[in-house]
A protein has these predicted regions:
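A structural signal for multi-pass alpha-helical bundles of membrane permease subunits
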Residues: 6-7, 18-21, 25-299
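Short, intrinsically disordered terminal tails adjacent to the first/last structured region
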Residues: 1-12
Length: 299
């Protein structure tokens, strides 16, 4: 004969109170998340909606335009003038971003592999020094970097800009190092016994196994010049608008004398700048997140 235990009244009351508290915390949590999502979405809407507006200036009276048009996008892409030369800016930024993507990715991965897998004198000191340098903002070195580039006649050139981006990328090797730390030592030792050099192990064994961290590094290397304003403004300071990157060009459109004529086109340009980044992230999101988590967990 089986018996079923019946909860006492006190136990039932305690269980009910626990469910109520859990429900209240759940509601509060969702309200906070909804508020954060709203705060995050407002700037996006503030950029997106005016880009479809028929009003050109910044002093519009409605958050949602009365009528929508694609003219701002068509104008900024197909009708460049002395102020808005967006196609040229876009191509300039794309060229710099692609070159930096290739150079920085190779640089970061090689540095990370050397620190993680190679044993040499001063390795620990070099690693600690790089971590210490990372504690200081890069803006502190901008004046020195500018005068070095000026001495080398590399100001107002894309080569100088790419050198700065690529040269500063190596300090971001820590997450990649954390990923390479997870590569089995026995795998590398077996390859060495077969006569493989360190370079061959890196390119033919480690890199094919490291797709998540490779994607993570590529995206970060592309985003740096694509979204940067400060370094680009410092180096490309000749005033020739055809040499500008997207960030400098769009910033120039917000000058007091221009903003009332170009604000809607500025918003359209901002949306167009975000499109390649969004597409790149959506396509590679899985590998990007995996690269961060796997590298950070070990590093």
């Amino acid at each position: 004969m089986s018996t079923t235990a019946v909860p006492s009244a006190a136990a039932q009351k305690q269980l009910k109170q626990g469910k109520v508290k859990k429900g209240i915390f759940s509601v509060i949590r969702h309200l906070v998340l909804a508020l954060l999502a709203f705060i995050w979405l407002v700037p996006i809407a503030w950029l997106l909606l005016p880009s479809f507006s028929t009003d050109k200036g910044i002093n519009f009276t409605r958050f949602v335009p009365e009528s929508f048009t694609m003219w701002n996008y068509v104008s900024i892409m197909t009708q460049p003038d002395s102020v808005a030369q967006f196609p040229r800016w876009f191509m300039n930024t794309l060229v710099v971003a692609c070159f930096n993507c290739v150079i920085s990715t190779c640089f970061v991965l090689m540095v990370a592999y050397a620190i993680s897998c190679c044993r040499f004198k001063g390795r620990k000191l070099l690693q600690n020094l790089s971590v210490t340098v990372n504690l200081f903002p890069g803006v502190l070195a901008m004046i020195a970097v500018y005068f070095v580039l000026k001495y080398m006649n590399l100001t107002n050139s894309y080569a100088g800009l790419i050198m700065v981006y690529a040269g500063s990328s190596g300090l971001g090797y820590l997450i990649c190092k954390g990923f390479f730390d997870t590569v089995p030592v026995a795998l590398r030792e077996a390859a060495k016994l077969d006569g493989a050099s360190e370079a061959r192990i890196f390119f033919q064994i480690v890199i094919p196994m490291s797709r998540p961290i490779l994607v993570y590094t590529i995206i970060n290397s592309f985003l740096t010049p694509w979204t940067d304003f400060v370094v680009a403004k410092m180096i490309l300071n000749s005033g020739v608008s055809t040499d500008w990157t997207v960030a400098i060009g769009l910033y120039n459109m917000l000058q007091k004398a221009l903003v009332n004529s170009y604000f809607s086109r500025f918003c359209a340009g901002g949306v167009l700048v975000a499109v390649p980044i969004s597409i790149l992230f959506v396509i590679m999101q899985k590998f990007y997140v995996e690269g961060i988590t796997s590298g950070a967990a070990k590093g």
